[in-house]
């Protein structure tokens, strides 16, 4: 029975360490996801501003009233 306990304890320990590392990685990915969302929001606002400038420029060229 004792010879079976050592491998089981080792397996339990390694599983616990692995689970802990996975949780840390998942938490880091969640934090990274928030940063990416902020970057996407900033990029989309930049795209909206750029589109507005291009539309104004095209309107200016079409109407020749700049």
From Swiss-Prot:
Its main location: secreted. GO terms for biological process: defense response to fungus; defense response to Gram-negative bacterium; defense response to Gram-positive bacterium; hemolysis in another organism; killing of cells of another organism. GO terms for molecular function: antioxidant activity. It is found in: Secreted. Expressed by the skin glands. The keyword Disulfide bond applies. The keyword Nucleus does not apply. Residues 23-40 form a propeptide. Disulfide bonds join 60-66. Residues 1-22 form the signal peptide. Keywords: Amphibian defense peptide, Antibiotic, Antimicrobial, Antioxidant, Cleavage on pair of basic residues, Cytolysis, Disulfide bond, Fungicide, Hemolysis, Secreted, Signal. InterPro entries: Frog_antimicrobial_propeptide. GO terms for cellular component: extracellular region. Displays broad-spectrum antibacterial activity against a range of Gram-positive and Gram-negative bacteria. Also displays antifungal activity against C.albicans ATCC 2002. Has low hemolytic activity, low cytotoxicity and low antioxidant activity. Belongs to the frog skin active peptide (FSAP) family. Brevinin subfamily. This is Jindongenin-1a. It comes from Amolops jingdongensis.
């Amino acid at each position: 029975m004792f010879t079976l306990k050592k491998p089981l304890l080792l397996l339990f320990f390694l599983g616990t360490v692995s689970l802990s590392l996975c949780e840390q990685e998942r938490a880091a990915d969640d934090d990274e996801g928030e940063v990416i969302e902020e970057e996407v929001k900033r990029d989309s606002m930049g795209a909206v501003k750029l589109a507005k400038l291009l539309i104004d420029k095209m309107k200016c060229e079409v109407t020749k009233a700049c």
